[in-house]
Amino acid sequence: MMATFSCVCCGTSTTSTYCGKRCERKHVYSETRNKRLELYKKYLLEPQKCALNGIVGHSCGMPCSIAEEACDQLPIVSRFCGQKHADLYDSLLKRSEQELLLEFLQKKMQELKLSHIVKMAKLESEVNAIRKSVASSFEDSVGCDDSSSVSKL
């Protein structure tokens, strides 16, 4: 019999620490973010935002990486949260502002379309459920009137 645990991230029942890769990434992200914020607080520094936030259509919720020195000097603060975003930033700088804006707006438009489709499907199912309940209650009330009129004859 396998032992069951609760996922550290979402609390669902699982056979390991995390229920899946998504929860594992989310938990590691959260821990890293909290450790960085503690270091900023320790040195009385204002948390710096990743420089990727300066590019149109890109954002990052992770504070810039911060490294403590061996001696009690001020820590080294990077412009980015990690190497992946530093590389992405460099590649995005090669593109024009208009190109980035167009790409961002196209993504946003696609997200809004999908969101709209989901909302419309939900509304349609609610309307159909109401129509069905109204139709069945109408049939019940009509059925009662017919039976009472028949018994009077």
From Swiss-Prot:
The keyword ATP-binding does not apply. This is Suppressor of RNA silencing. Signal peptide: none annotated. Changing C23S: Complete loss of C1 zinc-binding activity. The genome of this virus consists of three linear, positive, single-stranded RNAs encapsidated in separate virions designated RNA-alpha, RNA-beta and RNA-gamma. Three proteins (alpha-A, beta-A and gamma-A) are translated directly from these genomic RNAs and the remaining proteins encoded on RNA-beta (beta-B, beta-C and beta-D) and RNA-gamma (gamma-B) are expressed via three subgenomic messenger RNAs. Homooligomer. Interacts (via C-terminus) with replication protein alpha-A. Interacts (via N-terminus) with the movement protein TGB1; this interaction targets gammab-TGB1 at the periphery of chloroplasts and plasmodesmata. Interacts with host autophagy protein ATG7; this interaction disrupts the host ATG7-ATG8 interaction to promote viral infection. Interacts (via BM region) with host STY46; this interaction inhibits the viral infection. Belongs to the virgaviridae suppressor of RNA silencing family. Residues 19-47 are annotated as: Basic motif (BM). Residues 1-85 are annotated as: Interaction with TGB1. The lineage of its organism: Viruses, Riboviria, Orthornavirae, Kitrinoviricota, Alsuviricetes. Changing K35N: Complete loss of BM zinc-binding activity. Keywords: Coiled coil, Host cell junction, Host endoplasmic reticulum, Host-virus interaction, Inhibition of host autophagy by virus, Inhibition of host innate immune response by virus, Metal-binding, Phosphoprotein, Suppressor of RNA silencing, Viral immunoevasion, Virulence, Zinc.
